[in-house]
Amino acid sequence: MRSDMIKKGFDKAPHRSLLKATGLKDEDFDKPFIAICNSFIEIIPGHKHLNEFGKLVKEAVRAAGMVPFEFNTIGVDDGIAMGHIGMRYSLPSREIIADSVETVVNAHWFDGMICIPNCDKITPGMMMAALRINIPTVFVSGGPMAAGKTSKGDVVDLSSVFEGVGAYQSGKISEEELKDIEDHGCPSCGSCSGMFTANSMNCLCEVLGLALPGNGSILAIDPRREELIKQAAEKLKILIERDIKPRDIVTEEAIDDAFALDMAMGGSTNTVLHTLALAQEAGLDYDMNRIDAVSRRVPHLCKVSPASNWHMEDIDRAGGISAILKEMSRKEGVLHLDRITATGQTLRENIAHAEIKDKEVIHSLENPHSEEGGLRILKGNLAKDGAVIKSGATEVKRFEGPCVIFNSQDEALAGIMLGKVKKGDVVVIRYEGPRGGPGMPEMLAPTSAIAGMGLGADVALLTDGRFSGASRGISVGHISPEAAAGGTIALLEQGDIVCIDVEERLLEVRVSDEELGKRKKEWKRPEPKVKTGWLGRYAQMVTSANTGAVLKIPNFD
């Protein structure tokens, strides 16, 4: 066993002595050592209940004849961090999480790992670590929260609360109505109830094969979560015995299938960023062109909030992720069904008995929302390395208008609230990319303000930053190269005409190459916003969004 490095041989007597101080007995040194990578943190509702989850996981691991050791990672709540400097720490926290898991697991030579993530950057951070460490691993997420209901009976979620702020600001609702939405938008523990980033990544974890069937949709408060925990321990023991590791599971074909599910569900645009980062950790050459190819062959089968009033509990009731995959499998060339997963079985075997139980929630292949996926990759002179739009969250397929330019999210939000943006405008928020932000903050506050003011179909928003999974409307993010790297977005001037064509996958500014070249010569890179601490180091090492915004190790040659 891998853990023999710290527990076998006369020279490991000091190691065993220390381990006995934790409560181990001599017989435990013949069992696999299992890392329980938890992410319990009280300020995040999606993680507040994970302390109890950790106890259940440890019980299940012991029952399976293995020895559990629990530790916790950090976490950032994107909703609470939204709209202020805290959001700059969100994406960088993914790297800290990956590094901390790598540190604990490799320093102590664990034989296997069970990861308990849930929210936005915690799930991909742990997934990156699992691929980097490459020991048998199973994921059991904390599960989504239920949707809420106002006193009037309206179904609401966190997106409703953010949009309520814009609606109140523009006089569309009263302060009492906003308070009602606030009080009921997040009714329980769990990841926010729509197809936002957390749930998108937990669903993708399931189809990638790192998590068990049901992981993406079973609610946090559902007793079936406890059954998943028991299964996870049993399956991990099988993976250890068969030496099946994350890199055996997360192949190029598995990533194809993850994006296929993403397209079928219209997941968060952040999934592109995180899954490209996973590919980097797995040593795979996977780029945005391949994502676009997946998008072209996968129909959009279900719309979940913010694209509709359906939530993860509805997906679960309608058959869950397995039912969506089973329906997708009817179309030739969409899924790779014979690859191995964390169950020890193939994807085909995992979904064999699944079925759609409500075709209003999960559409059939014969009745898709659209013939192509709910995410699109756009390219053009404004995004030579690509940009992403959640096409399933807007009915507008082509938009052309003049730029209204802001050099930060704070500046943009203030301008929107002061009425500086009008119908037909293209709002540009730049210098908010991985390096420029730094940290590529999410733009949920500006998009929610636009939607709440009733301009969601009449104003477009472009950024080199990110969008929350709760964002909707004509929102194009991840523009690469970013402004801080001298991308075309940095060269835009007030009033330039921008064209967004979702069907043709184009993002263009109506300015000649000659004029853009002239502007590039005159452009000067702004001083970094942060030069010290973690964010200062992050800004120096982070790569572009089109490669997952991972950290690049300096070349010391």
UniProtKB/Swiss-Prot annotation:
- Organism of origin is Bacillus anthracis
The protein's assembly and partners? Homodimer.
The chain residues annotated with the modification N6-carboxylysine are K121
The pathway this protein participates in, as annotated, is:
Amino-acid biosynthesis; L-isoleucine biosynthesis; L-isoleucine from 2-oxobutanoate: step 3/4; Amino-acid biosynthesis; L-valine biosynthesis; L-valine from pyruvate: step 3/4
Q: What does this protein do?
A: Functions in the biosynthesis of branched-chain amino acids. Catalyzes the dehydration of (2R,3R)-2,3-dihydroxy-3-methylpentanoate (2,3-dihydroxy-3-methylvalerate) into 2-oxo-3-methylpentanoate (2-oxo-3-methylvalerate) and of (2R)-2,3-dihydroxy-3-methylbutanoate (2,3-dihydroxyisovalerate) into 2-oxo-3-methylbutanoate (2-oxoisovalerate), the penultimate precursor to L-isoleucine and L-valine, respectively.
Q: Which GO terms describe its biological process?
A: isoleucine biosynthetic process; L-valine biosynthetic process
- Its protein name is Dihydroxy-acid dehydratase
Q: Does the keyword Iron-sulfur apply?
A: yes
- Which top-rank group of organisms is this from? Bacteria
- Gene3D superfamilies of this UniProt entry? IlvD/EDD C-terminal domain-like (3.50.30.80)
Query: MF terms per GO, please?
Result: 2 iron, 2 sulfur cluster binding; dihydroxy-acid dehydratase activity; magnesium ion binding
> Could you give the cofactor binding note from the entry?
Binds 1 [2Fe-2S] cluster per subunit. This cluster acts as a Lewis acid cofactor.
Xref: InterPro entries: Dihydro-acid_dehy_C, DihydroxyA_deHydtase, DiOHA_6PGluconate_deHydtase_CS, ILV_EDD_C, ILV_EDD_N, IlvD/EDD_N
Q: Which NCBIfam families match?
A: ilvD, PRK00911.1
